[in-house]
Regions:
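Nucleic-acid endonuclease domains
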Residues: 1-2, 18-167
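Conserved catalytic cores of phosphodiester-cleaving nucleases, focusing on short active-site segments
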Residues: 6, 11-19
């Protein structure tokens, strides 16, 4: 299993972005939409929140941000809150994200790269409780009965509603 984007005690947080008008996201495996257990030595999760952030290219005059600006802001806040080591850990984590696919971003060496200068605005920001039965996505148990399918190889797109609640 991969590590969560964020963990707070037994609550996992997966962050996904999209340029679509809806909360439509590619999922790298069922581990991104299911509670983590404690088999890998980590903490068993009791809750998993998928944060869906919709982005669009900014128009002139919009209150926008670029990826380097966003990373700078987060890094500055982390330095103020917890010191230089916390910010350095964040920058290291950012550089590891996507590095295996060749699509990563190393803020220390790429912040001036024109490829990352495109300004964005946030269209929406939503949180989904992935333990809510109203969230109907592919789960490990859906695949487990297919003995000739490697569960860890399954990638798929989730199209989440504006809001969901089984209660």
């Amino acid at each position: 299993r991969s590590l969560r984007d964020f963990s707070m005690n037994s609550v996992g947080v997966e962050v996904k972005t999209t340029s679509r008008d809806t909360s439509s996201h590619l999922v790298q495996g069922v581990h991104q939409v299911e509670l983590a257990d404690d088999e890998d030595g980590g903490v068993a999760e009791t809750r998993l929140i998928l944060v869906s952030i919709g982005l669009k290219a900014a128009e002139p005059g919009d209150d926008s941000f670029t990826i380097p600006q966003l990373v700078d802001r987060i890094s500055s806040r982390l330095t103020e809150a917890g010191g230089h080591q916390l910010a350095e850990g964040f920058l290291t984590h950012v550089s590891e994200y996507g590095a295996g696919s060749g699509l990563g971003y190393d803020h220390r060496t790429m912040s001036a790269d024109p490829m990352f200068a495109m300004p964005y605005v946030t269209k929406f920001f939503r949180g989904y409780d992935m333990t809510d039965p109203a969230i109907e996505v592919l789960r490990r148990d859906d695949i487990a009965g297919r003995h000739h399918v490697d569960v860890s190889s399954v990638r798929f797109r989730v199209d989440l509603p504006l809001a969901a609640s089984a209660g």
